[in-house]
């Protein structure tokens, strides 16, 4: 809708009448849905709203910005065993593609869109695998916050060790 027709998001309901547009400053966090994607910056989604999402049956929350979810809301999702992915994991695609572009430029290469997509897919799969590796709790719940933090720490620690600093 946005990319092809340059339409407004609220026009989505014209084509899909079962959808609901929430506009005029209202927040979508009190609506029923399976997936929530907070994508505004810092503290968009709070504890009260997280409780409403859980009560309404959300099964996954993935950040699409830097810290749009408050610590209280994160706690609500984790206590309810909702799949919660922090922005450092789920929003890493844009930064990753920027890095790929810098690599292309420095090596004087030109990758096709398909090659970039394949590299991005590998990066995002690797992020997920590391979150699962380092974030799986004894009960099987994957704590993506813990997984992403430990994976990041391990990457830096291995680099420091490889340089002989420790």
Protein language model features and the residues they cover:
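Adenosine-phosphate binding glycine-rich loop
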Residues: 52-166
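A structured beta-alpha segment of the ubiquitous adenosine-cofactor-binding alpha/beta core
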Residues: 1-49
